[in-house]
Design a protein with these regions (language model features):
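Acidic two-metal-ion nuclease catalytic site recognized across multiple nuclease folds
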Residues: 5-9, 106-160
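Mg2+-dependent endonuclease catalytic cores in nucleic-acid-processing enzymes, primarily RNase H-like
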Residues: 1-114, 155-160
């Protein structure tokens, strides 16, 4: 996982332009780009056809989770615990990511009958003193790990 674009504040238009340039420069297909449908990314899908919108409150793939965001967060935790993810970033980004990962906690840990969920973003903000933007990004990236992109069947020679 690379953090290729990192800005403190961006307008919707600058995000669109930066994403287009990044996809061209790094040859990232639109099908491998995910944006937060609840944030500034909510309008991007209409301008960048084919990108994935992340709706964290949507129904999870696996019904043992509260919602899609929780399922992705648990997948992130699994990959981290199994040392199966690497993030290429600056030292400052690393420090912030470590801080934000510290607030990735399971909610309702005592309840045996409840679905698995994570503490709310508001609780995370209260603990951190800022929005967990890097954590959100990492959680959204797990969409591709829990929901693989369907592979198109390859056409055989002579067939259309």
């Amino acid at each position: 996982c690379y953090i290729r674009l990192d800005q403190e504040y961006s307008t919707g238009k600058s995000i669109e332009t930066d994403l287009k340039n990044m996809m061209i420069q790094w040859k990232i297909p639109r099908s491998m780009m995910v944006v937060d449908s609840d944030g500034l990314g909510s309008y991007l899908e209409s301008y960048l056809n084919g990108i994935k919108e992340f709706h964290g409150g949507n129904r999870p793939i696996n019904p043992e989770y509260d919602n899609l965001k929780s399922e992705c967060a648990f997948k992130l935790a699994e990959l981290i615990n199994n040392r199966q993810i690497r993030i290429i970033c600056t030292e400052a980004q690393r420090e912030r990511i470590m801080e934000e990962l510290s607030v990735l906690k399971q909610d309702h840990i005592d309840a045996d009958t409840r679905k698995k969920g994570i503490i709310s973003k508001e609780n995370m903000k209260d603990i951190l003193g800022h929005s967990p933007d890097y954590l959100d990004m990492l959680i959204m990236a797990m969409l591709f790990r829990i929901k693989p992109i369907p592979k198109r069947p390859k056409a055989k020679l002579g067939q259309i």
